Curated annotation (Swiss-Prot):
Enzyme class at the top of the EC tree: transferase
One term under GO cellular component: membrane
Higher taxonomy: Bacteria, Pseudomonadati, Pseudomonadota, Alphaproteobacteria, Hyphomicrobiales
Active site: 258
Name of the protein in its database record: UDP-3-O-acylglucosamine N-acyltransferase
Length: 357
């Protein structure tokens, strides 16, 4: 459910407009022609003027009490929807639903300026040598340093710091409290609140007199359509750039070390840590709390299960899991074997390691 205080009430949509936006087909043409949809919700919570979706059989039981005005679902479940509810059919109900939600609530797609309008707010600090194109918004307390460049339509939210020489493309958003240094940022990039981009990497040369700090003279490059979650950190490179490829989405609380190169359209979930000089191919997916050691390569399209520990190269297109990570089938066999062994020992009365008195 949306809250009008946070997201303005959208312009109502007819069923025909919803069908056009989503690519879905009206299953009952002529029914509910007068319906106007003004919001979205879950199958359990959506009201008579709201849209919901159904794409899994586990939620079929909810249909009996559903009050939604319309539901997007697959051909498989369309006949299960009560007659009082309008039905739109799509081969990908969730994607169709998201397309409509984006139209209704465009403000939810990126952080919004505090004052809600374009321009330089009172209390913003912009160096005289910084260059801002027309249509840039800078919130109170934000700092834009010497020689920095910000493209048209971009938003610098409250208390963000854009360091000297940083270049930000067009229609990008730098969230509240972000620090951004030694970085090149593309178009339509979103960096959420509190992220840290471009600080020096963790590099020290051990010696008998202590640890000698290694200068980090590279940059961070965020290509077009990258999104970085709140509280995530991306270190600049030591000698080469740290690069986040086009369309890659990074969740909250992710650590990316110096010299890491991440390909296009990757998904990196919360609490993942990627050590220095590691390379990810395109469309790689890392589950939550994955750890990746340094100087290894993960191939295009590979998927790593949550809480796994990657200690070496991973081939393209595979699914790995465990610690150390290995092919999923092998990991499952090991887990099954251990479970059976523990059950066998329990039946025989033998003590399990760690339980001896």
């Amino acid at each position: 459910m949306s809250e009008p205080a946070f997201f303005p009430l959208p312009t109502p949509l007819t069923l025909d407009e919803v069908a056009a936006l989503s690519g879905a087909r009206l299953a009952r043409p002529g029914a509910q022609d007068a319906l106007r949809l003004t919001g979205v919700g879950t199958l359990a919570d959506a009201g008579p003027s709201e849209l919901a979706f159904l794409d899994q059989s586990r939620y079929l039981a909810t249909l009996g009490t559903a009050r939604a005005g319309a539901i997007i679902t697959s051909e498989k479940f369309a006949g299960e929807v009560p007659e009082a509810i309008a039905v739109l059919v799509s081969p990908r109900p969730a994607s169709a639903f998201v397309a409509v939600t984006r139209q209704l609530f465009p403000q939810a797609l990126r952080p919004q300026p505090v004052f809600g309008h374009t321009g330089i707010a009172p209390g913003a600090f912009i160096h005289p040598t910084a260059s801002l194109e027309a249509g840039v918004t800078v919130d109170p307390g934000a700092v834009i340093g010497p020689g920095a460049e910000v493209g048209a339509g971009s938003v610098i939210c409250a208390n963000a710091v854009v360091g000297a020489g940083v270049r930000i493309g067009r229609d990008s958003t730098i969230g509240a409290g972000v620090s951004l240094s030694h970085a090149l940022v593309g178009n339509r990039v979103i960096v959420h609140a509190g992220a840290r981009i471009g600080q020096d990497g963790f590099g020290y040369q051990p010696g008998p007199g202590g640890h000698l700090k290694v200068p980090q003279i590279g940059r961070v490059v965020l290509q077009d359509d990258v999104e970085v979650g709140a509280g995530s950190t991306i270190d600049r490179g030591a000698l080469r750039d740290t690069v986040i490829g086009e369309g890659t989405k990074i969740d909250n609380l992710v650590q990316i070390a110096h010299n890491v190169v991440i390909g296009r359209h990757c998904i990196i979930v919360s609490q993942t840590g990627i050590s220095g000089s590691t390379t990810l191919g395109d469309f790689v997916m890392l589950g939550g709390q994955v750890g990746v050691v340094g100087h290894c390569t993960i191939g295009d399209g590979a998927q790593i299960a949550a809480s796994s520990n990657v200690k070496g190269d991973v081939p393209p297109g595979v699914r790995w899991g465990g610690s150390p990570a290995k092919p999923v089938r092998e990991w499952f066999r090991e887990m099954t074997t251990l479970k059976k062994l523990a059950e066998s020992r329990a039946r025989s009365g033998a003590a399990t390691p760690g339980e001896e008195e």
